[in-house]
Amino acid sequence: MPVYSMNVFKLTKEICEEINGILAKFWWGSGNEQKCMHWFSWDRLSLPKREGGLGFKELESFNVALLGKQTWRILERPHCLMARMLKGRYFPDTNIMHATQGQKASFIWKSILQGRDLVKKGLRYCVGNGTQVNAWFDHWLPVHPPRPPQKTNEAPTTVMVSELLNSTHSDWDHTKLDAWIVQEDVEIVKNIKVCASADEDLVGWHYTKSGIYTVRSAYWLAQHTSDMNPPRPPPGNPELKQMIWKLKTAPKIQHFCWRMLSGALTTGDTLRYRHITSDALCKRCCQEDETTIHLFFNCDYARAVWRGAGIPNPLVIDSTATLEAKLRAIFSLNSSPTIYLRQLPLWILWRIWKSRNTLNYQRKHISWQTTLRLAKQDATEWQDTVDILQTTTNNNSPRPGSRQGTRSWRKPLQGWIKCNYDGSSSRDNPSKAGWVIRDDTGQFIGAGQAEGRLTTTSLECEIQALVISMQHCWSRGYKNICFEGDNQELDSILNGRSPHFGVFNWLREVLAWKKRFQGCKFLWTGRKNNTPADNLAKQRLSQGTSFIFHHYIPFVIRNSLLLDCTLSSN
């Protein structure tokens, strides 16, 4: 694949189709020059695996996504040589997002503009003070694809987003929203977090957490915003196909199972349907048509193999069960603790297919006992190979395990306070927060519960709980304090290990409150060490109450606090 050229030039449709044809011939062919059956179009195979395809690259969309990277580079580094050269030639008085093709444009510039148009579709403003964002023209709603809200007839012609905020810039002006924006977009705007301390608007890529352009996310966007009708996925249950790619087995077995579910095997029934043959009779039993379910499960030969294998799931040999039900039962065995059950059923399918081809094309009969023995041998060899590779990998470069928290709640340093917080959310109700405050001896000095705003993700819910607990602790005059939660993603964001464009305003507010403390740290702990705060967050508040402070230990967290105290003392 000419990736280097595709980074700079927009390939013609004819070249893309020619390359697609070469790739398709390689995929469906057997390595020789003979003609081969293309069971599905390349467009259908190019669908993501989660949508039932095989995830091959659709070259035109991939080409545009690669070209978009050049536009992003110019936006990120406007003073680099390439950016300065193009600006001087094509857009001296504006920026690349508003540049036009102009006269006598080079082929490279025409290509870059096609990538620029894709970047435009995925750019979104994160509203800060709103002074740079035009409410009716700039893309600032976090929807797919990003867009401005739809305005009503009463709305002024030109409105900056700052005019939609209240006087303190801490929330939206609901009166203006209801009057100027159509109702279906009002709720979307109200769910956008604003921060009073924000001093500028931020532009980022909507389709990644970091807000940074990636070819992968841009390719997905190009695939899902095309003017052409999207291709139909190949036949078969998409949810069951997703299970295929999670199987711990050989890649060739995964693709074989995909072809089985998609109806892309050369069974007699399929060949007759495509008018390649008129005889669909099973060559083993000569009693029924050779359908996929008959070949692998219902034929006397296949039933003998499955009975000899002793697979404990009765669905496998149940003649009334569907093909999807049988395969689902086999896939579920792949998570079995027994190696025998994990691998053998999948290799039995493979060996039944191989023995069928030997019979049809070489006129050699392989007994069911031999087929079963070969399947067991394949399964054992594959598992032994995997074990050897894992042992080698662990010895040479051990993979870091999942992050482990401390075994018990820990007291803060002398002179510091620790506040454990947690959030609880539901789809249609405002999120809730719970927090527990303890001193450097582990003594309880307070706890709180509060109801916040409606949040759209669990991450937003956790950050809101942190903000509420910070506000409360600051109001009580604490100077040096640790805030400890159980969300690893939030911990990475707070400590600068991973940026997150989607919660940027929440992060702005956290950092603004952090500056008010003399000393402030953000810590992570395992969920079991955060049980008191978790229990408070899940506790329902009485109707009409949005905040409760507990001077004494609430009954709902008494046992968990006692356990924390006991373990930390030990």
Show where each model-derived region lies.
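A helix-boundary/hinge signal
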Residues: 1-570
